[in-house]
């Protein structure tokens, strides 16, 4: 996935901090910046940001990673958009947290648990 951002330096600081609990590795390229998270990858680059927000979800290996993501993302300048907890309206084991990034995108960490 690639996401346009208004300010790549500000977004880099946010995503490096927010995704640290996932063991993120940063990959730089001439066209943008990548974040490698095991078998997931995520790219940002400066560009026109769409009106409204995009919803991005990262699969966490456990609840502790979801909790750590929420703390790290808020510390990195994100805005709380849903504290860690169960979301049974999705399914019984859906444990997630939500934070708005510097461009207003809804960033989620989710652990699916047993369902």
Language model features: what each stretch is:
Residues 1, 52-56:
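Short amphipathic alpha-helical segments
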Residues 7-9, 57-103:
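Vicinal oxygen chelate
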Residues 109:
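Short glycine-/small-residue motifs
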